[in-house]
Amino acid sequence: EFVAAFQERILNTHPSLLPAFGGSMHAVAQALEHGVKVTGCTIHLVTDQVDGGPILLQQCVEVFPDDDVETLHARIREHEHRLLPLAVRAFAEGRVRVEGRCARVIAS
């Protein structure tokens, strides 16, 4: 009910480049298990589909050969912490345009 009441007005962070490894609390572990060379983070709008809302911002993060879940997740979090305020600001300033499943952030 909460999500339905605020459809596409809630921001979420996810520790992968959605749609890869979406819907999981273990996205970083899955990235390592699959041997991806690049993962990252996504800031997206929340919809009734888990991790399926329009994507606002993404940032790539290189996966190093000696990474484990903790080291990789720490680097991803740094980017999430940088991107989330940018997304909140764009949203608050009315610079987010949603068309279907696609979102654009208009430059300030």
Could you describe each region identified by the protein language model?
Residues E1-V105:
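Donor/substrate-binding cores of folate-linked one-carbon enzymes
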